[in-house]
Amino acid sequence: MPELPEVETVKNYLKENILNKKILNVEVLYPKMIENDVDFFKEELINHFFKDIHRRGKYLIFELDKFYLISHLRMEGKFNIKSVQDEISKHEHVIFYFNDFSLRYDDTRKFGRMKIISKDSLNDYFKNVGPDANNIQNDDLKEILHKINKSQKCIKTILLDQSIISGIGNIYADEILFKAKISPFKKGKDISFDELNQIVLYSKEILNEAIKYKGTTIKSFTSSLYHKGEYQNYLSVHKKENEKCKVCSNIIKRSKIDGRSTYYCPCCQGVK
C-alpha cells in the first residue's frame, strides 16, 4: 500500500501536470470505485478544473471550485498520464480526459475509492483520521499520547492505526521505530512522552527523506508511468531479515505482529 511519501510523490507529479486544465470528459469503468452516484460524479467534474491537489495521510484531495475529489489508492492504485488515443487497459477503471492527454486511475485489485464532497464537509470527512505524520504539532502530542497509552497493542500496530497518526504504513513504521530505538513489541500503555517525541521526530526525518527519493518501490509502486521510487535502497531494517544491522552489526530479525511482518534490530531496539 502506498504510504505518506508515495502519496506525496504522486501528488507532486499530478500538480506538475494537470492543474488548471479543463476536464473534457470522465469515463467510469468500475462504478463500485465511486462513492457517489456516478452521474453526479461525472457532472461535477466535466468542464471543471483541478485548482490544487492536497494530501492528508494516505489520501489525495483534488480541489475544484465548489467540491473536493477525495481519492484513496488503497493497495495498488496509481495515476498515469497517457495519450487520449492509448488503448484502455483492463486495470484502468476511471479516466479523466483533457485536451491533449488523459489521466487514468489504474488499480489491479480494485480496492481504491473516490468520492466528491462539498468543501464545507472536509473536516467531517476526516474526523476519524489522525494528524498527518509529517505535520504533527506540539499541541497534538498530548492527545496522541493519550490514545497510545490507552492501548494494550504493540506500538508497531498502533503506528499503523490511521485514526491515531495518519500516513504511516508497514515499511515506515519499521524504519521509524528502528531510528527511535524503540522495540516494536512495546505496549502502547508503556510508551513515554519522550518516546513519542522521538517517534514524531524520526517520522518527519524518514518520511521527508523518502519523499526526496520519490518513495519506496518494493513490489509495484510507481508515481507515474514506470517511474519507481528509490528509497528502498536506503532502508535500514525493512525487508533486511538476516542481514547485519548497519549500526551495531547484529542480525536483523523478522517477526509477525498482528499478522504484519515486522523487521527490527534486537540489539538497537532492546528486544530480548
Where do the model's predicted regions map?
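Phosphate/anion-contacting hairpin/loop surfaces
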Residues: 65, 69-167, 172-179, 187
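Surface-exposed binding/hinge segments that line
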Residues: 1-116
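Basic, nucleic-acid-binding surfaces and adjacent catalytic neighborhoods in DNA/RNA-processing proteins
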Residues: 22-41, 46-49, 54, 59-61, ...
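Alpha-helical structural motif
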Residues: 3-6, 10, 19, 37, ...
